[in-house]
Curated annotation (Swiss-Prot):
Keywords for the protein's UniProt record, in alphabetical order: Cell outer membrane, Cell wall, Membrane, Secreted, Signal, Transmembrane, Transmembrane beta strand
Pfam families from the UniProt entry: Autotransporter, Chlam_PMP, ChlamPMP_M
NCBIfam families linked to this entry: POMP_repeat
Membrane topology, from the record: Peripheral membrane protein
Protein name stated in the entry: Probable outer membrane protein pmp18
Organism from which the protein derives: Chlamydia pneumoniae
SUPFAM superfamilies, sorted: Autotransporter
Annotated signal sequence range: 1-16
Tree of life domain: Bacteria
Protein family membership: Belongs to the PMP outer membrane protein family.
GO cellular component, one term: cell outer membrane
Record's subcellular location: Secreted, Cell wall; Cell outer membrane
Length: 946
């Protein structure tokens, strides 16, 4: 059993099987955290997977009675306690059950069909009509059921390893976990075969594991149409196998929609003896049309394999749109590592609500494997887009080598497509010997309409026509953008590339010191090559600089010192000069306003003419023009997105927590020894000013205290409190979550027969802060942790104008409160991470002075009232100052800004009711208002007199 557990879990850790070697997903990959989480989730969601995989019943067992082999009767099993069928062979059709229509609904406990078999069709159940499996509460288990012949003439009809249904199968609204494990059919539908399969509205997870169809149709599911919809828990297809569609084969449309839970296809395999066209294809899914739309949850295809076409999906039409993250990783096929698109098809890939990522997908069209994500056959159109903040990322190339006449392949076609379409070879090993690992080939007309098209880290494009109707073309170090021929004529006549908004990824260039290349690629498939005098590249417009997030790079790269000869662009042209730069303005580098390092770029061209060497593509062209730039820094301008006001807000969070505690202590003088417990709530609103953003803070906590007094009514008190607070910065998504522990001591001394009193308080607090920051429209996320210590002291004097024996008295008072707060240095994690260290701590001296009034009433229950009004000036304040440094650029600045107004009005109110002579309940409120800050502090609790 332990070996089986390791086997099932390993499918999430293991990458593609490449040339007999296993690639393990390590931290260096873009999705390693995701796969680690999936591995942990598998055994949590499906605790019975190992038990069922190894279970072998020794005797027949069934809780089904009556006629179970009549295709003319309808069977309804509703509100059963449980349903079990073990090791049955009741009929040639349906080893455990055969009927006209079947409904299994509202079962309280387990549904189990285990190790039944049929010698013709449907290992467990055959349904001539519809099968409804809905609203069941316990586990649903179909395991080890077989549809295998005992004579060769039955082989082609052995379909539906567990279930065969002539019409529709609906699996819906089930709360329990569904297991379809180790079911097998000689022909098709390893687990389920039906006309239409609907898996929808389930709140329990579902697993199709290790099912197989020996023929050409659907290792787990085979149907005319399949719809997986609105499931709130994950659905897994793991280790299923068939000749076509390792997990699912559908004659028409396969739809994944509105699923908030993940839909995972992992380690499925399509292979049969015939490895020709229309065989051994679709490692996970084989269908005419595949749609992944409106899924908030993740859809992932990992480590699926097809011996022929489409390591993950083989289809004619594919649409991915309005969905959360969609991942294609470690898949492989002979053609189309992840996706194979059949003739006259269409592919739409829109990263609207989450990223679409292709990583480490391979195909084996020749002796050696190459990285390929999508392979388009003849007359297949391609549309790709990404919305703001998202990306369609291809770490493996796309192949569209067949020309579509009079059609533009649209990239970022819609106005909302302001995101990034990224082609990157960042994860291709430097040891790769095949240039095809890096090249995306488009023998068509590509149009960029919005957003950003980016080529990075050695990625290459070969494109017949390219037009920039909008958006930005971003090129990084060692990227190549080149011409190619048309498929039908095998000629480059008419090949034109028009680029009018070019951006260079400056941090990438500074890291490798190699410029991206625009190239009139030579003709010829092998040596000797020759210059191609047909294509034209028109480069126009201003040149700009960006970083990986399409932001100004002046806070991403270290530009504090002058830099000479920065390689910006390399034009590899033919002798006749077919790259036109007459309307290209590199001087545009100095026209944009930006934050970060300020300075001046001095761009210049260097032109070199060489002798043609026809033995290599790279040495054929003779005209080399290289654009360089010299950088001269002039200063630094802090970007408000990076400024870091949120770190100062943590100081004020600690200050307000302790200041409110010290102000509250003046009300705590008790004549008799007491113990109290209370709930507390604190609200603070700090206005923004020209120097810093404001914030609002909410804190909830509790307090425990006790007081003791002497015969002369001198009292001593101690208080322990904890506050859990959240601070939210104004006009941003930055926040601070804190946990504060405070200990306070108080001494009260009455004098002159209690008409004059003095008190002193001392408080210390310790706070843990978790700071989260978000910037650049959510593109950048950082977080950090630190702690702070705050020390405060208060002295107060009051004079009662009337004796305490009177029902009403007034008491003028004056109080001095001093607070010091400091916090530790810390470093954020994430993109554009910063380091923070304290330059100056916070000091504050406030002197409230005002008047209190107290009275009591004894209607039914003794009740005491106390109100206070005070003027609250700040006599001394040292605002905190923090040194901030930005790791990505090496820049630093001093942060200071938020301040309290010098004058405020404070007010308090207290109501205490004695339910019993020694037990009272109370409600306190105190607040303050100034031009900068508003505070509200609430207490509700009980006091017991000893």
């Amino acid at each position: 059993m332990q070996n089986n557990r390791s086997l099932s879990k390993s499918s999430f850790f293991v990458g593609a099987l490449i040339l007999g070697k296993t690639t393990i997903l390590l931290n260096a990959t873009p999705l390693s955290d995701y796969f680690d989480n999936q591995a942990n989730q598998l055994t949590t969601l499906f605790p019975l997977i190992d038990t069922l995989t190894n279970m072998t019943p020794y005797s027949h067992r069934a809780t089904l009675f009556g006629v179970r082999d009549d295709t003319n009767q309808d069977i309804v099993l509703d509100h059963q306690n449980s349903i079990e069928s073990w090791f049955e062979n009741f009929s040639q059709d349906g080893g455990a059950l055969s009927c006209k229509s079947l409904a299994i609904t509202n079962t309280k406990n387990q549904i189990l069909f285990l190790n039944s078999f049929a010698i013709k069709r449907a290992g467990a159940m055959y349904v001539n009509g519809n099968f409804d499996l809905s609203e069941n509460h316990g586990s649903i288990i179909f395991s080890g059921n077989l549809s295998f012949p005992n004579a060769s003439n039955f082989a082609d009809t052995c379909t539906g390893g567990a279930v065969l249904c002539s019409k529709n199968v609906t699996i819906s609204k089930n709360q329990g976990t569904a297991y379809f494990i180790n079911n097998k059919a000689k022909s098709s539908g390893g687990a389920i075969q039906a006309a239409i399969i609907n898996i929808k509205d389930n709140t329990g997870p579902c697993l199709f594991f290790n099912n197989a169809a020996g023929g050409t149709a659907g290792g787990a599911l085979f149907a005319n149409a399949c719809r997986i919809e609105n499931n709130s828990q994950p659905i897994y297809f793991l280790n299923n196998q068939s000749g076509l569609g390792g997990a699912i084969r559908v004659h028409q449309e396969c739809i994944l929609t509105k699923n908030t839970g993940s839909v995972i296809f992992n380690n499925n395999f399509a292979m049969e003896a015939d490895i020709s066209a229309n065989h051994s294809s679709g490692g996970a899914i084989y269908c005419i049309s595949c749609s992944i739309k409106d899924n908030p949850g993740i859809a992932a295809f990992d480590n699926n394999t097809a011996a022929r076409d489409g390591g993950a999906i083989c289809t004619q039409s594919l649409t991915i749109q309005d969905s959360g993250p969609v991942y294609f990783t470690n898949n492989q096929g002979t053609w189309g590592g992840a996706i194979m698109l059949r003739q006259d098809g269409a592919c739409t890939l829109f990263a609207d609500q989450g990223d679409i990522i292709f990583y480490n997908n391979r195909h084996f069209k020749d002796t050696f494997s190459n990285h390929v994500s999508v392979n388009c056959t003849r007359n297949v159109s391609l549309t790709v887009g990404a919305s703001q903040g998202h990306s369609a990322t291809f770490y493996d190339p796309i192949l569209q080598r067949y020309t579509i006449q009079n059609s533009i392949q649209k990239f970022n076609p819609n106005p909302e497509h302001l995101g990034t379409i990224l082609f990157s070879s960042a994860y291709i090993p430097d040891t790769s010997t095949s240039r095809d690992d890096f090249i995306s080939h488009f023998r068509n007309h590509i149009g960029l309409y919005n957003g950003t098209l980016a080529l990075e880290d050695r990625a290459e494009w070969k494109v017949y026509k390219f037009d920039q109707f909008g958006g930005t073309l971003r090129l990084g170090s060692r990227a190549v953008f080149s011409t190619t021929d048309e498929e039908q004529s095998s000629s480059s006549v008419g090949s034109v590339i028009n680029i009018n908004n070019l951006a260079i990824n400056l941090p990438s260039i500074l890291g490798n010191r190699v410029a991206p290349k625009l190239w009139i690629r030579p003709t010829g498939s092998s040596a000797p090559y020759s210059e191609d005098n047909n294509p034209i590249i028109n480069l126009s417009g201003p040149l700009s600089l960006l970083d990986d997030e399409n932001l100004d790079p002046y806070d991403t790269a270290d530009l504090a010192q002058p830099i000479a000869e920065v390689p910006l662009l390399y034009l590899l042209d033919v002798t006749a000069k077919h790259i036109n730069t007459d309307n290209f303005y590199p001087e545009g580098l100095n026209t944009t306003q930006h934050y970060g390092y300020q300075g001046v770029w001095s761009p210049y061209w260097i032109e070199t003419i060489t002798t043609s060497d026809t033995s290599s593509e790279d040495t054929v062209n003779t005209l080399h023009r290289q654009l360089y730039g010299d950088w001269t820094p002039t200063g630094y301008k802090v970007n408000p997105e990076n400024k870091g006001d949120i770190a100062l807000s943590a100081f004020w969070q600690s200050f307000h927590n302790l200041f409110a505690t010290l102000r509250y202590q003046t009300q705590q003088g008790q004549i008799a020894p007491t113990a109290s417990g209370e709930a507390t709530r604190l609200f603070v609103h700090q206005n923004s000013n020209n120097d810093a953003k404001g914030f609002h803070m909410e804190a909830t906590g509790y307090s425990l205290g006790t007081t003791s007094n002497t015969a002369s009514n001198h009292s001593f008190g101690v208080n322990f409190s904890q506050l859990f607070s959240n601070l939210y910065e104004s006009h941003s998504d930055n926040s601070v979550a804190s946990h504060t522990t405070t200990v306070a001591l108080q001494i009260n001394n009455p004098w002159l027969q209690e008409r004059f009193s003095t008190s002193a308080s001392l408080a210390y607090s310790y706070s843990n802060h978790h700071i989260k920051a978000s910037g650049y429209s959510g593109k950048i996320q950082t977080e950090g942790k630190c702690y702070s210590t705050t020390l405060g002291a208060a002295l107060s004097c009051s004079l009662s104008l009337q004796w305490r024996s009177r029902p009403l008295h007034f008491t003028p008072f004056i109080q001095a409160i001093a607070v010091r707060s400091n916090q530790t240095a810390f470093q954020e994690s994430g993109d554009k991470a910063r380091k923070f260290s304290v330059h100056k701590p916070l000091y504050n001296l406030t002197v409230p002075l005002g008047i209190q009034s107290a009275w009591e009433s004894k209607f039914r229950l003794p009740t005491y009232w106390n109100i206070e009004l005070a003027y609250q000036p700040v006599l001394y304040q040292q605002n905190p100052e923090v040194n901030v440094s930005l790791e990505s650029s090496g820049s630093s600045w001093l942060l200071s800004g938020t301040t309290l107004a010098r004058n405020a009005i404070a007010f308090k109110g207290r109501n205490q009711i004695f339910i019993f002579p020694k037990l009272s309940v109370f409600l306190d409120y105190q607040g303050s208002v100034s031009s900068s800050t508003t505070t509200h502090y609430l207490h509700a609790g009980t006091t017991f007199k000893f």
